[in-house]
Regions:
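Conserved N-terminal subdomain of the carbohydrate kinase-like
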Residues: 2-120, 267-275
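Short pre-catalytic strand/loop immediately N-terminal to key active-site residues, enriched for Gly-Thr
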Residues: 16, 202-217
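Glycine-rich beta-alpha junction loops
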Residues: 15, 42-44, 86, 112-114, ...
Length: 276
């Protein structure tokens, strides 16, 4: 008898144009034979990275009502995976999901900033709200900027792997498993990587050659592969390696000159993910 697919509740924004957030998370997890139940924190005409001011639809009452409906139906979630929140109050929505499904594997991608700055449009109350949410997670996946924001450290420029590893270790006081992404100061800047840490365990690092192009949405693809691989039984380090390799493959499958704001050509790379 074939085992039923694992089921993930993905609490993220849904952009219509541009490959990011739920528009890449759903196909990635489906390719990994993981069912995704999408709970949009906002519906946007585009993602928020360089495509102008998107049209936005937000319904604060929808999320809590949807969770209660799923709970009444007896839906079982193996994982709850959150990302972009439209405002600090939405952290309560994710916490509600954690409380309704306490046995689910809880993953938080603390979307706060990148490139050494807090994302525009996020209020000062978002950092403490995200910190509180991370403290209730099993695994958090910040980039180097978000790691600094969560820890109250100076915002980084190009950090070293050693600095990121120290931050990851400190963040295990917040959540038991941590993966810090976007570490660029590796091998004289020739590589980009991630560092992982587990409470009471040894740290690890994964690197891939640094690509000269920077696409929006690759962090969402990375985290989705990471979640999918863990749910399929991979240990975190192996899941991180698979996620980093697939992001590199997505970039290779995207032609030179493609508009980086629109994200990688995920459609070309998904068959490779299914084969792995």
């Amino acid at each position: 008898m074939t085992n039923a697919p694992k089921t993930v509740l993905a609490i993220h924004d849904l952009p219509g144009f541009g490959r990011a957030a739920l528009s890449v998370i759903v196909p990635v997890l489906s390719t990994l034979s993981v069912q995704t139940v999408a709970l949009p924190t906002a519906v946007l005409s585009t993602h928020t990275g360089g495509l102008g001011t998107p049209a936005k639809l937000a319904n604060p009452g929808y999320g809590p009502a949807a969770l209660e409906h799923y709970h009444r139906l007896g839906v079982k979630f193996d994982c709850i995976y959150s990302g972009y929140l439209a405002d600090a109050a939405q952290a309560k929505l994710v916490e509600q999901a954690f409380e309704l499904w306490p046995r689910a594997f809880k993953v938080v991608d603390p979307v706060l900033g990148d490139g050494g700055r807090l994302y525009s449009g996020l209020g000062a109350d978002m950092v403490p709200a995200m910190y509180s949410l991370c403290s209730k997670a099993d695994l958090i996946v910040p980039n180097v900027t978000e790691a600094a924001l969560l820890l109250g450290d100076p915002l980084p420029g190009v950090g070293s792997a050693e600095q990121a590893a120290a931050q990851a270790a400190r963040l295990t006081r917040v959540a038991p498993q941590v993966v810090v992404t976007g570490v660029t100061g590796i091998g004289g800047g020739r590589y980009i990587g991630c560092v992982g840490a587990a409470r009471g365990g040894e740290g690890y690092a994964v690197k891939t050659p640094l690509q000269p192009r920077m696409f929006h949405g690759t962090g969402d693809i990375f985290a989705a592969v990471l979640v999918g691989r863990i749910l399929r039984g991979n240990v975190p380090q192996a899941a991180v390696q698979a996620a980093a390799a697939f992001v590199a493959e997505c970039i290779r499958q995207t032609p030179e000159g493609a508009d980086e704001r629109l994200g990688v050509w995920l459609e070309n790379a998904l068959p490779k993910l299914r084969q792995e």
